[in-house]
């Protein structure tokens, strides 16, 4: 199987490059930037991509690849920091420049292989503080922006390319076409990566694990698909456990029980942990601490269950690529954005190995696998939900009052989107609440009430997202229902921040 190898220099978009390439049915793998030449050769890449990153090439501790990579006679594309590595390696000069974050117009100077069919100009997403002052002698400029005269370069043999912008994010017009040009036309990679093949290989590999597997299921698509993949491989050696942590959506506990007991043929146990979780969260306001508390309590309950119902050899989790990259667990130098409750090493005293069959996949790939495994349709269309639940949709301390407000308000948002036939067209929609209050008028009296924030976004894979432009009439209807049906709420706001710079969840 042909493969594109992406060297991770710490960009939060590194996995997104792989994701985009997989859309072409070409396998892409992310590896550490300092991979040895020997190990890179073993991967036998059809092409190599250098990701972006937060470093500057002129820093003494700047991450750099093995210089012999450029002698492999394999096409190379450098993105942002990767572009600067190429310039620096071939004798050009990088300088500190005015930071450029956001959209810029890229003017095409030469329809090189990677810019073939792109047109005269496109909007490109910039995220950098350095730029090429002088390009190497053997290179030519193939694209520029107002602030970057060498935003795209290519060597004269058309085998090494550097671009200062990010083609992998949806904010770059025709960015997918640029990557496709590199992968399919420059690298000539075969398109033979499919989810059907992934399922086949995963089942074969999982069938080799020894002992019994304990799988925590949340009722979401990630953990459900992970459980079904494992069950397909090892059958009744899998035990699924659902923990009601008191942080779920309205009526979700009952829906999960019905789905597993009536639709899916797996061993299933429900544990009521509401009091345990909420008591541990009492007084906790820091978002990272809340995530850690939720993660620790899941581990504590699984440990107790394992001791009483074991022995188990593995603990299975529905960890995805975005979870890993946002938690900084990838092997590149990425900064931690936030810690996901199901990522990272388990404590030694748990005595269980981790099984994460979806760790290298993105959300939409998981949805494709769900269809292959005949997952119920209502689960396929349900919006993503964070592992720590409503704890990260409540700003400040988690209280029963805030949980009730968030549940009811989120349910109103979902109902109105469904009534407008828009629920399946958006990626995610929910309500969040914090500690701030605002004055309102009820009857002839003033009162202070909670502020509810409505967050609705469009996305492909959760790595980037754009806020959804709803009709004003629908926003008004949602707002009126929330303030009329929830006594504690006086104000409703609509969040218009995209990812980046914001994240999809508030915490």
Q: Where on the chain are the PLM-derived regions?
A:
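Active-site regions of oxyanion-processing enzymes, predominantly non-cytosolic
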Residues: 316
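RNA-binding accessory domains that recognize and position tRNA/RNA substrates
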Residues: 1-50, 54-60, 64-65, 70-72, ...
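Conserved helicase ATPase motor motifs in RecA-like P-loop NTPase domains
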Residues: 76-82
């Amino acid at each position: 199987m042909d493969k594109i190898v992406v060297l991770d220099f710490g960009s939060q978009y590194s996995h997104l490059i792989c994701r985009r390439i997989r859309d072409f049915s070409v396998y892409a793998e992310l590896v550490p930037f300092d991979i040895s030449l020997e190990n890179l050769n073993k991967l036998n890449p059809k092409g190599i991509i250098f990701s972006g990153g937060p470093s500057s090439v002129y820093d003494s501790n700047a991450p750099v690849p093995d210089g012999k990579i450029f002698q492999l006679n394999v096409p190379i594309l450098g993105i942002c920091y990767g572009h600067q590595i190429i310039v620096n390696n071939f004798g050009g000069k990088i300088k500190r420049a005015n930071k450029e974050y956001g959209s810029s117009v890229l003017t095409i100077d030469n329809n090189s292989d990677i810019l073939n069919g792109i047109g005269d100009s496109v909007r490109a997403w910039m995220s950098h503080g350095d730029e090429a002052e002088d390009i190497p002698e053997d290179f030519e400029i193939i694209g520029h922006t107002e602030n970057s005269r060498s935003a795209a370069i290519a060597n004269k043999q058309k085998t090494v390319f550097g671009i200062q912008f990010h083609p992998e994010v949806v904010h770059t017009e025709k960015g997918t076409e640029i990557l496709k040009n590199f992968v399919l036309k420059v690298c000539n990679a075969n398109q033979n990566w499919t989810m059907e093949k992934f399922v086949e290989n995963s089942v074969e590999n999982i069938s080799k694990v020894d002992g019994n597997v304990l799988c925590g299921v949340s009722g979401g698509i990630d953990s459900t698909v992970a459980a079904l993949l494992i069950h397909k491989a090892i059958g009744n050696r899998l035990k699924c456990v659902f923990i009601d942590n008191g942080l779920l959506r309205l009526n979700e506990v009952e829906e999960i029980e019905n789905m597993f007991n009536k639709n899916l043929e797996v061993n299933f146990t429900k544990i009521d942990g509401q009091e345990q979780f909420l008591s541990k969260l009492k007084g906790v306001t820091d978002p990272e601490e809340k995530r850690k508390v939720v993660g620790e309590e899941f581990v504590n309950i699984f440990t107790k269950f394992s001791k009483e119902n074991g022995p188990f050899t593995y603990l299975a989790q529905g960890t995805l690529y975005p979870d890993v990259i946002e938690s900084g667990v990838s092997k590149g130098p990425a900064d931690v954005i936030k810690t996901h409750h199901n990522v990272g090493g388990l404590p030694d005293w748990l005595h269980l190995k981790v099984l994460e069959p979806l760790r290298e996949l993105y959300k939409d790939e998981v949805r494709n696998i769900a269809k292959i495994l005949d997952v119920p349709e209502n689960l396929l269309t349900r919006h993503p939900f964070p592992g720590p639940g409503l704890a990260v949709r409540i700003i400040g301390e988690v209280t029963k009052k805030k949980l009730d407000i968030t549940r009811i308000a989120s349910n109103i948002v979902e109902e109105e989107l469904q009534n407008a036939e828009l629920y399946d067209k958006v990626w995610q929609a929910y309500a969040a609440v914090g500690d701030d209050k605002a004055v309102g008028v009820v009857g002839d009296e003033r009162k202070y009430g909670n502020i509810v924030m409505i967050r609705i976004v469009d996305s492909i894979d959760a790595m980037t997202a754009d806020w959804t432009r709803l009709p004003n009439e629908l926003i008004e209807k949602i707002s009126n229902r929330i303030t009329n049906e929830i006594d504690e709420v006086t104000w409703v706001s609509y969040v218009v921040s995209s990812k980046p710079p914001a994240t999809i969840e508030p915490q």
